[in-house]
């Protein structure tokens, strides 16, 4: 049995997959990606210019581990607390538009497909790509 995504550190894998998605150049990033906040509980837009690739890599990893998942499930995962000033904080979901656009971009790359029962799941090609990148990450961490 080969190396899977579960065998490597999630942070290093997500960074490696984001670099792969950026290097492939096939993913279409929306023009509003530089000015948008990722949720209504954020005060600022992301500092990282490549946040779209990082979010796509994170969603791919999540779909590898827990598939299928829809837009609503992803908004729950990336949700956090909203600070209301003097009023107590409350949980708030993240942006559904961002999750939907990332999933659509991954569908154009043939990494993700719609599931018959609802939500999205990884394609066999997507699973192969993720396993290959996980093996590369494992090799890099071994050599250090």
Curated annotation (Swiss-Prot):
<dbReference type="GO" id="GO:0000028">
    <property type="term" value="P:ribosomal small subunit assembly"/>
</dbReference>
<dbReference type="InterPro" id="IPR036388">
    <property type="entry name" value="WH-like_DNA-bd_sf"/>
</dbReference>
<dbReference type="GO" id="GO:0006412">
    <property type="term" value="P:translation"/>
</dbReference>
<dbReference type="InterPro" id="IPR036390">
    <property type="entry name" value="WH_DNA-bd_sf"/>
</dbReference>
<dbReference type="GO" id="GO:0022627">
    <property type="term" value="C:cytosolic small ribosomal subunit"/>
</dbReference>
<dbReference type="InterPro" id="IPR001266">
    <property type="entry name" value="Ribosomal_eS19"/>
</dbReference>
<comment type="similarity">
    <text>Belongs to the eukaryotic ribosomal protein eS19 family.</text>
</comment>
<dbReference type="GO" id="GO:0003735">
    <property type="term" value="F:structural constituent of ribosome"/>
</dbReference>
<dbReference type="InterPro" id="IPR018277">
    <property type="entry name" value="Ribosomal_eS19_CS"/>
</dbReference>
<dbReference type="GO" id="GO:0003723">
    <property type="term" value="F:RNA binding"/>
</dbReference>
<dbReference type="Pfam" id="PF01090">
    <property type="entry name" value="Ribosomal_S19e"/>
</dbReference>
<protein>
    <recommendedName>
        <fullName>Small ribosomal subunit protein eS19</fullName>
    </recommendedName>
</protein>
<keyword id="KW-0687">Ribonucleoprotein</keyword>
<keyword id="KW-0689">Ribosomal protein</keyword>
């Amino acid at each position: 049995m080969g190396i899977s995504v579960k065998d490597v550190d999630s942070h290093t894998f997500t960074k490696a997959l984001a670099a792969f998605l950026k290097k492939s150049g096939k993913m279409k990033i929306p023009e509003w990606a530089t000015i948008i906040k990722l949720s209504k509980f954020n005060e600022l837009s992301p500092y990282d210019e490549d946040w779209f690739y990082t979010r796509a890599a994170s969603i791919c990893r999540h779909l590898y581990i827990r598939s299928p998942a829809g837009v609503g499930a992803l908004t729950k995962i990336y949700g956090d607390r909203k600070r209301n000033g003097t009023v107590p904080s409350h949980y708030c979901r993240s942006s559904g538009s961002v999750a939907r656009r990332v999933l659509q971009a991954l569908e154009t790359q043939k990494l993700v497909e719609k599931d018959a029962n609802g939500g999205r799941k990884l394609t066999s090609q997507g699973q192969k790509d993720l396993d290959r990148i996980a093996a590369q990450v494992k090799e890099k961490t071994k050599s250090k």
